[in-house]
Amino acid sequence: EPTSHLDLPNTIEIMQLLRELAQKTKKAILLSTHELELTLQVADKIWMMTSEKLKTGLPEDLILSGDLQKTFGTERFRFDETTGGFRMNYPANKEVSIQGDKGVSYYWTERALLRNGYKITENSPLWININGDGKWILHLNTHHQEFYTIENLLFTMSEWESKFLSE
């Protein structure tokens, strides 16, 4: 593992250098690593060893076939085929709906909500509108409030649940 004791920027640098070296010299470089998310971005071929067998293929083919999820997924986390990363499976005991822009703000809002025990549903009385310009609007019945950070949004959601939804 050539990068096992390096910080992230240096790990990325080494992986890029190894890829460039392999391309320039037309030689294969075989390495062992636990940096799976990074490997998916730089490897031309992956060899995955399980207790049953060896699976090989392009990173994209191993993802699309479901082999990465089967090999690395557990009850507590899963491999997300869309992002190429791992996602924690958080227990959800609250519901919220999200509407609006499906861009970067949506992704990070959803991630924060899941981490804080929310299940994203279609028709929750508690819902968030994301307008894409750094503003979130929280709605519950006749109540609504604007936010400019996810932290403040989450804080108010917790307050509203105690005040309005627990009645």
Predicted feature residues:
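Helical segment within the ABC ATPase nucleotide-binding domain
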Residues: 11-24
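ABC ATPase nucleotide-binding domains
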Residues: 74-167
